[in-house]
UniProtKB/Swiss-Prot annotation:
Catalytic activity: L-homoserine + succinyl-CoA = O-succinyl-L-homoserine + CoA
Active-site annotation: 142, 235, 237
Source organism: Serratia proteamaculans (strain 568)
Protein name per UniProt: Homoserine O-succinyltransferase
Gene: metAS
InterPro entries for this protein: Class_I_gatase-like, HST_MetA, MetA_family
Pfam families: HTS (PF04204)
Disulfide bonds: none
Alphabetic keyword roster: Acyltransferase, Amino-acid biosynthesis, Cytoplasm, Methionine biosynthesis, Transferase
Localization terms from the record: Cytoplasm
Residue numbers binding substrate: 163, 192, 249
SUPFAM superfamilies documented for this protein: Class I glutamine amidotransferase-like
Main location (coarse class): cytoplasm
Length: 309
């Protein structure tokens, strides 16, 4: 699906170089099509890199998606130019009276930070509560999953002693579920987190359907029965070199990180890794857009009643 973004957004030229169909707003306005409105709450430090990753996965379908980027942290960014944030991001107050077909809440490097110490925790709570009445389906990724489980289900923060980092094999538990339609019985996906998501805890404290898991990673993909909530605890959006960049960053900082599992050839950080999860990431996002967003959202968002019959 061609994604509609501002003409000047850096992702436009970046993704077009990959032959990804990106439609600038100026052209999209000439087509009489009701685009899906998708809001992305980008909590990652390197926002431009994260934009490229998610927009790539959202682009592979025949309908238009109108992308809106949201920020909730008013502090000065160390990794993204202020001009970029001011030009391409909106504040919550700008969109709080609008409705959206989809919302994506990204991960954040906050695995060792208590919720009460997260600078924008009240804003996270506000957005998640707001989405109940203003968004058809919300997709939470990595740390955002942990935050949402706490806010929506009261599940306390669970933290691993050692960071989970690498590319892991997962089992599809419900192959005929809409979100896993077309999945192989086993598939690979990257993880980079301290957060822990034991399958038994998800089953005990929620009514969410667990769709994919791994012995090493715990629950990977789960969703609400009404399709309004979807959770993915890994990073299917990551580029081939994202884990390598994180490993080098932590190593340079003297944190003595573990080498990401099943990632570098021969587990040698001097060798260039290859992505083994791209097809899974594209299929996951295509299924979410089709079955959780497009097929249940109203044509007129002013008449939103995002529930299944």
């Amino acid at each position: 699906m061609p994604i509609r973004v501002p003409d000047e957004l850096p992702a436009v030229s970046f993704l077009r170089n990959e032959n990804v169909f990106v439609m600038a707003s100026s052209r999209a306005k000439t087509q009489e099509i009701r685009p899906l409105k998708v809001l992305i709450l980008n909590l990652m430090p390197k926002k431009i890199e994260t934009e490229n990753q998610f927009l790539r996965l959202l682009s592979n379908s025949p309908l238009q998606i109108d992308i809106q980027l949201l920020r909730i942290d008013s502090r000065e960014s160390k990794n993204t130019p202020a001009e970029h944030l001011n030009n391409f991001y909106c504040d919550f107050e700008d969109i709080q009276d609008e409705n959206f077909d989809g919302l994506i809440v990204t991960g954040a490097p906050l695995g060792l930070v208590d919720f009460c110490d997260v600078a924008y925790w009240p804003q996270i709570e506000r957005v998640i509560d707001w989405a109940k009445n203003h968004v058809t389906s919300t997709l939470f990724v990595c740390w955002a999953v942990q935050a949402a489980l706490n806010i929506l289900y009261g599940i306390p923060k669970m933290t691993r002693e050692v960071k989970l980092s690498g590319v892991y094999q997962h089992q599809t538990l419900q192959q005929h579920a809409l979100l896993t339609r077309g999945f192989d019985e086993t598939f690979l996906a990257p993880h980079s987190r301290y957060a822990d998501f034991p399958t038994e805890i998800i089953r005990q404290y929620t009514d969410l359907d667990i769709l994919a898991e791994s012995e090493q990673t715990g629950a990977y993909l789960f969703a609400s029965k009404d399709k309004r909530l979807a959770f993915v605890t890994g990073h299917p959006e990551y580029d081939a070199l994202t884990l390598a960049g994180e490993y080098c960053r932590d190593n340079d900082a003297g944190l003595n990180p573990v080498v990401p599992l099943n990632y570098f050839p021969d587990d040698n950080p001097e060798l260039t890794p290859k992505a083994s999860w791209r097809s899974h990431g594209h299929l996951l996002f295509a299924n979410w857009l089709n079955y959780y967003v497009y097929q249940i959202t109203p044509y007129d968002l002013r008449h939103m009643n995002p529930t299944l019959e």
